[in-house]
Amino acid sequence: MAVAGAMVMSGALLLLHLLAFTCVACNGGSELPPISRRSFPKGFIFGTSSSSYQFEGGAVLGGRGPSIWDTFTHQSPDKITDRSNGDVACDSYHLYKEDVRSMKEMGMDAYRFSISWSRILPSALSGGVNREGISYYNNLINELLSKGVQPFVTLFHWDSPQALEDKYKGFLSPNIINDYKEYAETCFKEFGDRVKHWITFNEPWTFCSMGYASGIMAPGRCSSWEVGKCRVGDSGREPYTACHHQLLAHAETVRLYKEKYQALQKGKIGIILNADWFVPLSQSKSSSDAARRALDFMLGWFMDPLIRGDYPLSMRELVGNRLPEFSKEQSGMVKGAFDFIGLNYYTSSYADNDPPSHGHNNSYNTDAHAKITGSRNGIPIGPQAASFWFHIYPEGICEMLLYVKENYGNPTIYITENGVDEVNNKTMPLEEALKDDTRIEYYHKHLLALLSAMRDGANVKGYFAWSLLDNFEWAEGYTVRFGINFVDYDDGMKRYPKNSARWFKKFLQKSNRDGNKRLKRVAYNAFSN
């Protein structure tokens, strides 16, 4: 077994190097080849994404109970760059019809949004279903369908009810598994006749690493010496516990849906994972090993259990008894528990070996022994976006998709988030704020890279831009803007299409499919040797 494991690892490391030659970006300064809806296979889905806390507002309206993000932003405003919150956000709670009309006008096929758990069940099922919350989502779903837009529904996008956090510390307790399953079943019963794509969890990596290791996002738990300087938490154990319970809740819910609802409702169910790409800092084996470990600790943390029934070997070896174990029954339940995988891709980084130091504190953030950086020899991996963590690297989406294809059996994939931010410059005239040519270039290059991966066999069925609107961007508040539509937070949340929204409208125009093969070939050549 040791020899077999070494051979698998060696093959995976070789793949990291091969992918670097497969996905080569367009040279800067050259004109980008044309691309449109016609470049993609028939039936390929295009849409935009959002989440309840970032978009809805209506925090105390319609019977909604507080979520952990309400508590976090109000009790720890210093952890939000501009000390803001999502009490109003984009006010999609009131303006959803306008937003759906915008999607229709752009020609979007689908809209991925999340349901606020605390708007449906302010506590647990025993506390009763909030019918006003059910009505809001019924209205949204019906409005989407009336305009020909498919709903892709995320059940959990980081905003669990504060009542469950108070009752048993939320995802740190196995009690959350049944409460989550009851919440999901409520949604299947109420909306499943019209919703054909369900997502159980969005980015468990972000929720667990930022919420329980760094402490910079809700519920704001970490060891006292970590960056979040939290009052309570254990950065070496709690991230693994919380995500273990999310995986089990996911698997239980998928089993429930498949056994009880899928045949009748004819929908599909999956999960969304982060998909940053990591490039070895140097040609050394230690850098390649570090890049693989970084992938294991981000993507493999979830893909390995979903495909193989257990955590990656690197995690089991490095984390030891701080990493929960699956029972035989749990392993069998988690393995294969999906119809599709959603991947959110934004950026890539370099990875280098970071040797352990004696007597260091245990933390998820250092367990991979990988030093992550955005530059090599002072040269960034790609242009800097507005956020400090964000470098633009289109090749990464291609490399990640081919890595998933080769390592995880080429599952059905949707790119469920992809986009870039700009600084929210409050002094900039509106006319100038709508000129987001960098975003257009970002989408153009990433869609070309996506086509390249599909040309090489990646099983991708759809693409969702982040995001429809500027919105509350978690720890960064309203200091950055990700939207293809501008939101004027100071003037009634008025929406204005940016140039990127107009670009998407042109990109999505439905016409005859002549030239499809030519466009595919041009796009492929732009990202290959």
Curated annotation (Swiss-Prot):
It is an enzyme of class 3 (hydrolase). Disulfide bonds join C222-C230. The active site is at E203, E417. InterPro entries: Glyco_hydro_1 (IPR001360), Glyco_hydro_1_N_CS (IPR033132), Glycoside_hydrolase_SF (IPR017853). Residues 1-25 form the signal peptide. GO terms for biological process: carbohydrate metabolic process. A beta-D-glucoside binds at Q54, H157, N202, E203, Y346, E417, W466, E473, W474, F482. Its EC number is 3.2.1.21. Gene3D superfamilies: Glycosidases. It catalyses: Hydrolysis of terminal, non-reducing beta-D-glucosyl residues with release of beta-D-glucose. Glycans are attached at N361, N425. GO terms for molecular function: beta-D-fucosidase activity; beta-galactosidase activity; beta-glucosidase activity. Keywords: Disulfide bond, Glycoprotein, Glycosidase, Hydrolase, Signal. Belongs to the glycosyl hydrolase 1 family. PANTHER family: BETA-GLUCOSIDASE 9-RELATED, GLYCOSYL HYDROLASE. This is Beta-glucosidase 11. It comes from Oryza sativa subsp. japonica. The lineage of its organism: Eukaryota, Viridiplantae, Streptophyta, Embryophyta, Tracheophyta.
